[in-house]
């Protein structure tokens, strides 16, 4: 009898957990503070982000990024978004591009 109750409680807990994990979030308020400084949340975007040490990325291993540097910012060696002009050894005429992977 005790093991049946335990199994039932465990089953209900698992179903509740799955429901929470798969339910859509109706409010965008959770995004506030989710990303770091100079970053913006974008769950639909895929590709290689601009970096100080790679101004023309062609391939990257990170495909599920949801926090992207805001326009005019790139990632430095510590993965912080900084202004393009603050990158070390960057000429003023250097253009940064990014590779976007289609859905």
Curated annotation (Swiss-Prot):
InterPro entries documented for this protein: Ser_inhib-like_sf (IPR036084), TIL_dom (IPR002919)
Signal peptide positions on this chain: 1-22
Keywords, alphabetical: Signal
Domain TIL: 35-87
Pfam families, A to Z: TIL
Family: Belongs to the polydnaviridae EGF-like motif protein family.
Protein name: Probable protease inhibitor Egf0.4a
Organism: Microplitis demolitor bracovirus (isolate Webb) (MdBV)
Phylogenetic lineage: Viruses, Viruses incertae sedis, Polydnaviriformidae, Bracoviriform, Microplitis demolitor bracovirus
Gene: O4
């Amino acid at each position: 009898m005790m093991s049946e109750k335990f199994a039932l409680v465990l089953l209900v807990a698992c179903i509740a957990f799955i429901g929470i994990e798969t339910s859509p979030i109706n409010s965008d308020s959770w995004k506030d503070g989710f990303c770091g400084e100079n970053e913006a949340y974008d769950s639909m975007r895929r590709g290689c982000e601009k970096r100080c040490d790679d101004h023309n990325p062609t391939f990257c291993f990170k495909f599920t990024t949801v926090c992207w540097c805001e326009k005019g910012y790139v990632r430095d060696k510590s993965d912080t978004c900084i202004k393009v002009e603050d990158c070390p050894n960057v000429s003023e005429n250097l253009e940064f591009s990014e590779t976007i992977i289609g859905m």
